[in-house]
């Protein structure tokens, strides 16, 4: 069997473990030397203090025994070296072994993984042997359970083990090799590696990947491409978003007279259409925003003020962003009831259209709808469905978002109304969507998720929902079919994502549900 390179992370890990074992066992095994003094007969407080000669009788001393201590250390060293050597030999011989894909999560040099394995019929005490392997590599066990075997072999055990553990990334290959030596059918229930996603709201600081497709510095067709003053202004406002961290108040922007004039033209033009084209939820929230959050034609509302308004209404908060975010990062923010919102405004030469999201689009289109409880939940559900989803599913969810949150229609009082932010912030498309020209289809998440769309001109197809509640129910049904090795739940108290990947995690979540049910039952009892 080839000897592993002494410089590999696995070999270094073994040497460290052996060194620690030497120290621990040296303390645990008390060995008395040949010339050590015997017990004192005079009651001297100091071991080894000589008693008077007349009363002292030397006692025979046992010969020093070091064989067992040396044997333990030598056995441990050989065992670890053998495991490293076995891992070094096994990895190249298994080219199809998905060692790198088995990690569920990686952070600070540690890999967290889920494993399933079955005991070998020829080796008793398979679980204790596997646990010994985990101890060898100083793995931290998060969860361990036995399960009925999903694919028992003829004459083999009908039991398998599931373990979730954390181990140094450099020791992963050797640990897996060690588990294979004492058990069989070692595999990961999670399958392919799950993409990283934020677990805490503060981790949204990492969700800042921008799409530069419509950046005025790069897009030749952008209205502001040839305007150096506008481009410099955009960079100045974008820096606010780049410096922002969760928990900070959103810095205020002093808008120029030209920017306010652009806002005024958009504001007054669209407001004239809302009464006949916008849904009731938008109209109700818009009136409240005018009353409490500085919405008026001669003032561009500040994000901090609007964020406080939304927080009180539906729990949603705003967060400044420098431009168009990647779909994965943007949808992940919605899972925490956080909406990434731009602060810059479109170019003055094109007030009725912007190739990218700007504050007119966000404040006039998105914010009023996020003030509605049912719609806010619908938006968060899309975000929750995106966490840990594959790239293919992210593309479908972002398309679904496009045809609902951005360009969705709904039925109200026998009429079709607009609720999508892309419609409510675009005068031309708001007229177009309710004309006879486009095709109107009943909302079906499966169809909407794969429907081709336009981002350069008006849509040729729109989807109409019976109600927001109906759309929410259909979305949840669609999301339940997304393949993930876990489910997720938002904790509104800690603003964190609970990953439901074990019976214990589900049980903890149910305890909170039971508390809420008890409160509601008590309320009904008091009312009755």
Curated annotation (Swiss-Prot):
Regulation: Inhibited in feedback fashion by the catecholamine neurotransmitters, especially by dopamine in competition with tetrahydrobiopterin. Phosphorylation of several Ser/Thr residues in the N-terminus regulates the catalytic activity. Ser-62 and Ser-71 are readily phosphorylated to activate the catalytic activity. A Cysteine modification induced by N-ethylmaleimide (NEM), inhibits tyrosine 3-monooxygenase activity through the modification of the Cys-207.
GO cellular component labels: axon; cytoplasm; cytoplasmic side of plasma membrane; cytoplasmic vesicle; cytosol; melanosome membrane; neuron projection; nucleus
EC category name: oxidoreductase
Reported impact of residue 376 to V: In ARSEGS; loss of over 80% of tyrosine 3-monooxygenase activity
Effect of residue 71 to E: Suppresses feedback inhibition induced by dopamine. Suppresses feedback inhibition induced by dopamine
Region Disordered, residue ranges: 33-65
GO molecular function: enzyme binding; identical protein binding; iron ion binding; tyrosine 3-monooxygenase activity
Tissue spec: Mainly expressed in the brain and adrenal glands.
The keyword Metal-binding is assigned to this record: yes
Effect ascribed to mutating residue 319 to P: In ARSEGS; complete loss of tyrosine 3-monooxygenase activity
Catalytic activity: (6R)-L-erythro-5,6,7,8-tetrahydrobiopterin + L-tyrosine + O2 = (4aS,6R)-4a-hydroxy-L-erythro-5,6,7,8-tetrahydrobiopterin + L-dopa
Impact after mutating residue 309 to S: In ARSEGS; complete loss of tyrosine 3-monooxygenase activity
Effect of residue 62 to A: Affects subcellular localization. Accumulates mainly in the soma of the neuroblastoma cells
GO biological process: anatomical structure morphogenesis; animal organ morphogenesis; dopamine biosynthetic process; dopamine biosynthetic process from tyrosine; eating behavior; embryonic camera-type eye morphogenesis; epinephrine biosynthetic process; eye photoreceptor cell development
Effect of residue 246 to Y: In ARSEGS; loss of about 40% of tyrosine 3-monooxygenase activity
Substitution effect: residue 337 to H: In ARSEGS; parkinsonian symptoms in infancy; no effect on tyrosine 3-monooxygenase activity
Annotated consequence of substituting residue 359 to F: In ARSEGS; loss of over 80% of tyrosine 3-monooxygenase activity
Mutagenesis or variant effect for residue 441 to P: In ARSEGS; complete loss of tyrosine 3-monooxygenase activity
Residue numbers binding Fe cation: 361, 366, 406
Maturation and modification: Phosphorylated on Ser-19, Ser-62 and Ser-71 by several protein kinases with different site specificities. Phosphorylation at Ser-62 and Ser-71 leads to an increase of TH activity. Phosphorylation at Ser-71 activates the enzyme and also counteracts the feedback inhibition of TH by catecholamines. Phosphorylation of Ser-19 and Ser-62 triggers the proteasomal degradation of TH through the ubiquitin-proteasome pathway. Phosphorylation at Ser-62 facilitates transport of TH from the soma to the nerve terminals via the microtubule network.
Pathway(s) per entry: Catecholamine biosynthesis; dopamine biosynthesis; dopamine from L-tyrosine: step 1/2
Disease: Segawa syndrome autosomal recessive: A form of DOPA-responsive dystonia presenting in infancy or early childhood. Dystonia is defined by the presence of sustained involuntary muscle contractions, often leading to abnormal postures. Some cases present with parkinsonian symptoms in infancy. Unlike all other forms of dystonia, it is an eminently treatable condition, due to a favorable response to L-DOPA.
Oligomer status and interactors: Homotetramer. Interacts (when phosphorylated at Ser-19) with YWHAG; one YWHAG dimer binds to one TH tetramer and this interaction may influence the phosphorylation and dephosphorylation of other sites. Interacts with NT5DC2; the interaction results in reduced phosphorylation and decreased catalytic activity of TH.
Name the UniProt record assigns to this protein: Tyrosine 3-monooxygenase
Species classification: Eukaryota, Metazoa, Chordata, Craniata, Vertebrata
Gene: TH
């Amino acid at each position: 069997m080839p000897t592993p390179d002494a410089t590999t992370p696995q070999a270094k890990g073994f040497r460290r473990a052996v060194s620690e074992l030497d120290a621990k066992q040296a303390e645990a095994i008390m060995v008395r030397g040949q010339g050590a003094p015997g017990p004192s007969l005079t009651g001297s407080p100091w071991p080894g203090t000589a008693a008077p000669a007349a009363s002292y009788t030397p006692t025979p001393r046992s010969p020093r025994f070091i064989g067992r201590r040396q044997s333990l250390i030598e056995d441990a060293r050989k065992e670890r070296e053998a495991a490293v050597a076995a891992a070094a030999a096994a990895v190249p011989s298994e080219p199809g072994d998905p060692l790198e894909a088995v990690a569920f999560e990686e952070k600070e040099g540690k890999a967290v993984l889920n494993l399933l394995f079955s005991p070998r019929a020829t080796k008793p005490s398979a679980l204790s042997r596997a646990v010994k392997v985990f101890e060898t590599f100083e793995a931290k066990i998060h969860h361990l359970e036995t399960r009925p075997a999903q694919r028992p072999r003829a004459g083999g055990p009908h039991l398998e083990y599931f373990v979730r553990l954390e181990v140094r990334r450099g020791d992963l290959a050797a640990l897996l090799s060690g588990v294979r030596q004492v058990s069989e059918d070692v595999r990961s229930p999670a399958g392919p590696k799950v993409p990283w996603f934020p677990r805490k709201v503060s981790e949204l600081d990492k969700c800042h990947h921008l799409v530069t497709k419509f950046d005025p510095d790069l897009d030749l067709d952008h209205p502001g491409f040839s305007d150096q003053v506008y481009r410099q202004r955009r960079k100045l406002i974008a820096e606010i978003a780049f410096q922002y961290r969760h928990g900070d108040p959103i810095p205020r922007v002093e808008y120029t007279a030209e920017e306010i004039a652009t806002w005024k033209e958009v504001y007054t033009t669209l407001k004239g259409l809302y009464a006949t084209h916008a849904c009731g939820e938008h109209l109700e929230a818009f009136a409240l925003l005018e009353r409490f959050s500085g919405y008026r034609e001669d003032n561009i509302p500040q994000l901090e003020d609007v964020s406080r308004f939304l927080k009180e209404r539906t729990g949603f908060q705003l967060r400044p962003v420098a431009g168009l975010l990647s779909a994965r990062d943007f949808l992940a923010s919605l899972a925490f009831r956080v909406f990434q919102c731009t602060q810059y405004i479109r170019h003055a030469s094109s007030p009725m259209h912007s190739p990218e999201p700007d504050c007119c689009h966000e404040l006039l289109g998105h914010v009023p709808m996020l003030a509605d409880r049912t719609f806010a939940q619908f938006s968060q559900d899309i975000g929750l469905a995106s966490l840990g989803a594959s790239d293919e599913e992210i593309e479908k969810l972002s398309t679904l978002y496009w045809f609902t949150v951005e360009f969705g229609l709904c039925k109200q009082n026998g009429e079709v109304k607009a609720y999508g932010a892309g419609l409510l912030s675009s005068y031309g498309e708001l007229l177009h969507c309710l004309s006879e020209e486009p095709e109107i289809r009943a909302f079906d998440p499966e169809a909407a998720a794969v429907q081709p769309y336009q981002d350069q001109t008006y849509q040729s197809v729109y989807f109409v929902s019976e109600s927001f509640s109906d759309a929410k129910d259909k979305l949840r049904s669609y999301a339940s079919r997304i393949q993930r090795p876990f489910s997720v739940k938002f904790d509104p108290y800690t603003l964190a994502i609970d990953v439901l990947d074990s019976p214990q995690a589900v049980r903890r979540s149910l305890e909170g549900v039971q508390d809420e049910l008890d409160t509601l039952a008590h309320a009904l009892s008091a009312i009755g």
